[in-house]
């Protein structure tokens, strides 16, 4: 470790101890050397004894800075790792930091645009940022080419070395977790950090976010439910993104939405429909749909439309994952726990040798109490959480795409019930899921698959004769090879039989000669000739094996 890393690690540990976070480690795991090390190098009393543990963890992460704040936000979605009182506190972490100098942002924009001054591309550039976060900040301007209002998102200068340094230390701490916590190995801390690293590094590349936004906008073009602002790719680079400026009501501002006459029931239901459309129709979903990234258009409040921003984190599911997920939901709400267990095994989410009966019993034990509530109050996100937590006891591997899905679903549910507390998520989602599953099977699905593949087969038609000829030639060559191998095996079998025959005769002659040499010395050279014949037979048998 470099001196800088040692200093930073020392500061991190002192911060954790000042908030009494050593309480997370069972006393039996704190050995005498560790205790001496703690009191000699890190004498730091808990200065926040009056606060609950979850709040202390949140405050410590806030003190450690942006990288740790975002790490805490990610951990808040992994409710399989923490009890609710800690996960709820981590969810309160706010990614708000002081803005960096607008002049620096202006310099970065000019560097990204080939060294030309900002005024060559933009009018009314606002040096004061509109918003600021740990990774980037946003400035407003107008495009010189068409006068449209835009926002310019710029990555913080020199943020990458800071992120890499702190990630290296987070990895070090993650490797200590299995040694300090009894359940540490099951939590797979290194995998959790690796997942966070990928998400964070992806957020540093604004070209990726631009592509995500363009894709989502295309998927919901002319949709009455969701609007994604236009991105101007000619102005985008890894460190800068330019997109249409939008005006909307923050989805968390319920009072303003009601004052504007918004149809709250329809708005809440559309949030659910948008989510399931992204997941099951498009296989591409916005995975950071917390209230800060969602607005509602001022226009047509009786027919409300969402506006989504900040598309840095997206998720996708393959066709099999979508089918298993939809069938899991329907089987769960039908209380068919056997089907749920079988789907987990069939999907490969749990090992194929899993005992289905035991797994079914475990799912029933955990999930049956959920139905004590009315269906309208059951949370899809918590259903998934309960299923995944149970499956992890049966060695379910961490599925990053499903973790993202569960996190997003919790956001969608939270927003929906904040807007309209009577929202019946199951009633809204069930027709969509049943319709989607119906579309995946039967004759319509077969016809659709044929239509999708038809251009491919039309393109390959001229190549078919050659492909058939090649297949026949390869088949003939394969048959010739198989016949050759069969003949060699038969020949080896015959040689081995002959070898065993000669070795048996040789052994008999040698033993007979030895016996006669000892018991019948009057027979003269006869025993010697028998032994010599036996050795010759042995030699012939040995040669047959080669």
Curated annotation (Swiss-Prot):
A GO CC term attached to the entry: plasma membrane
Name of this chain's protein: Probable protein kinase UbiB
Any Pfam family: ABC1
Database matches in PANTHER family: CHAPERONE-ACTIVITY OF BC1 COMPLEX CABC1 -RELATED, PROTEIN ACTIVITY OF BC1 COMPLEX KINASE 7, CHLOROPLASTIC
Primary site of residence: membrane
Organism: Escherichia coli (strain SMS-3-5 / SECEC)
Function, as annotated: Is probably a protein kinase regulator of UbiI activity which is involved in aerobic coenzyme Q (ubiquinone) biosynthesis.
Cellular localisation: Cell inner membrane
Top-level taxonomy: Bacteria, Pseudomonadati, Pseudomonadota, Gammaproteobacteria, Enterobacterales
Domain of life according to the entry: Bacteria
Domain Protein kinase: 124-502
Family matches, as NCBIfam families: PRK04750.1, UbiB
Keyword annotations from UniProtKB, A to Z: ATP-binding, Cell inner membrane, Cell membrane, Kinase, Membrane, Nucleotide-binding, Transferase, Transmembrane, Transmembrane helix, Ubiquinone biosynthesis
């Amino acid at each position: 470790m470099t001196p800088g890393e040692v200093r930073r690690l020392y500061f991190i540990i002192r911060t954790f101890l000042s908030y009494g976070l050593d309480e997370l480690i069972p006393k039996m795991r704190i050995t005498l050397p560790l205790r001496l090390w703690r009191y000699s190098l890190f004498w730091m009393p808990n200065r926040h004894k009056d606060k609950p543990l979850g709040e202390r963890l949140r405050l410590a992460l806030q003190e450690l800075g942006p990288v740790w704040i975002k790490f805490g936000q990610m951990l808040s979605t992994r409710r399989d790792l923490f009890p609710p009182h800690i996960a709820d506190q981590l969810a309160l972490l706010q990614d708000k930091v002081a803005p960096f100098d607008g002049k620096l942002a202006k310099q970065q924009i000019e560097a990204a645009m080939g060294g030309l001054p900002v005024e060559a591309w933009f009018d009314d550039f606002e040096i004061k940022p509109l918003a600021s976060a740990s990774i980037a900040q946003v400035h407003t301007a107008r495009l010189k080419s068409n006068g449209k209002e835009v926002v310019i998102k710029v990555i913080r200068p020199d943020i990458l070395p800071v992120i890499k340094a702190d990630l290296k230390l987070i990895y070090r701490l993650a490797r200590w977790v299995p040694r300090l916590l009894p359940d540490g190995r099951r939590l797979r801390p290194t995998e959790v950090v690796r997942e966070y690293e990928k998400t964070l590094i992806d957020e540093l590349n604004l070209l990726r976010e631009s592509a995500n936004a363009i894709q989502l906008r295309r998927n919901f073009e002319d949709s009455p439910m969701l609007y994604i602002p236009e991105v101007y790719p000619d102005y985008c680079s890894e460190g800068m993104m330019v997109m249409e400026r939008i005006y909307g009501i923050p989805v968390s501002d319920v009072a303003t939405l009601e004052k504007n006459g918004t149809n709250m029931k329809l708005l809440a239901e559309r949030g659910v429909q948008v989510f399931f459309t992204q997941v099951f129709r498009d296989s591409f979903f916005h995975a950071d749909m917390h209230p800060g990234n969602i607005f509602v258009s001022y226009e047509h409040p009786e027919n409300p439309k969402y506006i989504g921003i900040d598309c840095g984190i997206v998720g996708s599911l393959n066709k099999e994952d979508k089918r298993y997920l939809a069938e899991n939901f329907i089987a769960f709400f039908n209380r068919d726990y056997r089907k749920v267990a079988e789907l987990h095994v069939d999907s490969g989410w749990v090992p194929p040798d899993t005992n289905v009966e035991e797994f079914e019993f475990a799912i029933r034990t955990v999930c049956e109490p959920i139905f004590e509530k009315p269906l309208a109050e059951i949370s899809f996100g918590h259903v998934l959480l309960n299923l995944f937590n149970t499956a992890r006891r049966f060695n379910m591997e961490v599925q990053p795409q499903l973790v993202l899905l569960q996190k997003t679903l919790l956001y969608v549910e939270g927003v929906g019930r904040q807007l309209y507390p009577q929202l019946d998520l199951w009633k809204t989602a069930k027709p969509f899921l049943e319709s989607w599953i119906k579309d995946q099977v039967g004759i319509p699905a077969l016809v659709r698959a044929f239509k999708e593949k038809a251009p491919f087969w039309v393109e390959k038609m001229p190549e078919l004769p050659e492909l058939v000829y090649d297949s026949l030639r390869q088949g003939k060559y394969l048959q010739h090879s198989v016949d050759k191998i069969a003949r060699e095996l038969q020949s080896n079998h015959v040689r081995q039989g002959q070898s065993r025959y000669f070795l048996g005769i040789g052994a008999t002659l040698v033993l007979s000669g030895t016996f006669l040499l000892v018991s019948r010395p009057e027979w003269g050279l006869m025993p010697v000739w028998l032994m010599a014949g036996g050795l010759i037979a042995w030699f012939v048998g040995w040669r047959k094996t080669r």
